[in-house]
Amino acid sequence: MASKSHDLTHGPLVQQIILFSLPLMATNVLQVLFNMSDVAVVGQFAGPEALGSVGSTSILVSLFTGFLIGMGSGINVVVARYIGARHDQDVHEAVHTSLILSLIVGVIIMALGFLFTPAMLSMLGTKPVLMAGAVSYLRIYCLGMPAMAVFNFGNAVLSAAGDTKKPLYFLSMAGVINILLNLFFVIVCHLAAAGVALASIISQYISAALVILSLRRSGSVVRLERSMLRIEPHKARQVLSLSIPAGLQNAIFAIANLFIQAGVNSFDELMVEGNAAAANADALVYDVMAAIYTACSSFMSQNYGAGKRKRIIHSYFISMVFSFGIALVMSALLVIFGRQFLGIFTNVEEVAQAGMIRLRIMGCSYAFSAFMDCTIAANRGLGKSFVPTVIVIMGSCVFRIIWVYTVFAYFHTIESLYLLYIVSWAITAAEMICLRRVYREQMQKLPPDIDGVKATA
């Protein structure tokens, strides 16, 4: 079967990266908005206690979903590289192997999350008044992990093939259903936090079904065929060697944030609720930037498979500038219109005041995460994940934990807690040094004049 996938190895890079990223941004923003609808509906119609219950689970939700998103990014790189190299049989094997692996991981996370929810929430120091609602919300949410794993698999495969529009359509359909179910379960059925969790998992299974149906009907090289559903050992090793470190990188952020959440929980309930409301901005900014990182990884991987040196490194720099600039604009808007933003989630003035503290500090910090995250995506696009993972562990996990137990413990102000983000991003910008070495090593593996630029030693 000839590949009918979108070619990312020819044409004007700036235009291509922008056009590739925009549907991904819309997809990610819609996902964030639908997640925000959970918080908004709970905050407006179920009260501050239910809002705090949902907010208390946010770090654990990020831990589980972050690992699955990382799995997807590894799948994206492997599939994109084979598409770029025009190795259709390898694409088939990678796609079908990845689907089975994703399902297995999703089921494992579901089981572990469901069983250990009370213990994990207790470790975070969740307030007793919020515990029952938090346990109910998180356990129900965990039942949707297999569906989320499948959707992330499909999103990764379609993006690797250059199609970023279909996931947007699927998520839009599932998201509208999610909002309607949120309102029904909370307002009509009075299920509070459990209601929005139930709405979420129903919409997740709908989006997973849509993406699988699309791949089954696809006329391109990424078509799913029942007869090919098996784990091919070599492809499994390739996928896991990138997916597990990528998943761990995302999970490590969440693990470090567990300690940060414990720090937030040491303040009163108003601060916890304000933090929960303001933290929605994190997802909004990060997920818009993440669309560009996916573009960076996809373009670099396809062009590496095709042996296009200049396009590989240019993809990185264009993505870096693009993500930094967008973060600056979004940060400015959040700081200027912060009170209006927080008003979506709470009508309690004291909660909004607490949330503004986080928005102001994080608004000055978001853009600097591009140096780390875009470089992580670039390393992954070149097939290297181990060293970036070590750097992230040291800079974003170990350092943040040390900060919580030293700087924050000494000052014990919410400002001293939030400032650790920008400092840790500065440290993990050392990823850029790692990329230079990885790039030089990988370029030596390509034929010397494949794109008209002689390889450098």
Predicted features by range, described:
Residues 1-21, 79-146, 188-244, 300-365, ...:
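Short alpha-helical transmembrane segments in multi-pass integral membrane proteins
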Residues 72, 141-159, 167-175, 196-211, ...:
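Short runs within selected transmembrane alpha-helices of multi-pass transporters and secretion channels
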Residues 8-45, 59-74, 78, 103-110, ...:
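N-terminal transmembrane alpha-helices
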Residues 29, 33-51, 121-128, 184-191, ...:
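Helix-terminus/linker motif at the lipid-water interface of multi-pass membrane proteins
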Residues 19-38, 140, 151, 174, ...:
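Transmembrane helical elements of multi-pass membrane transporters/channels
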Residues 42-62, 128-133, 193-194, 198, ...:
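Interfacial/gating helices of multi-pass transporter permease domains
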Residues 51-111, 148-167, 261, 274-338, ...:
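Small-residue-rich hydrophobic transmembrane alpha-helices
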Residues 63-66, 178-182, 208-212, 284-287, ...:
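Hydrophobic transmembrane alpha-helices of multi-pass small-molecule transporters
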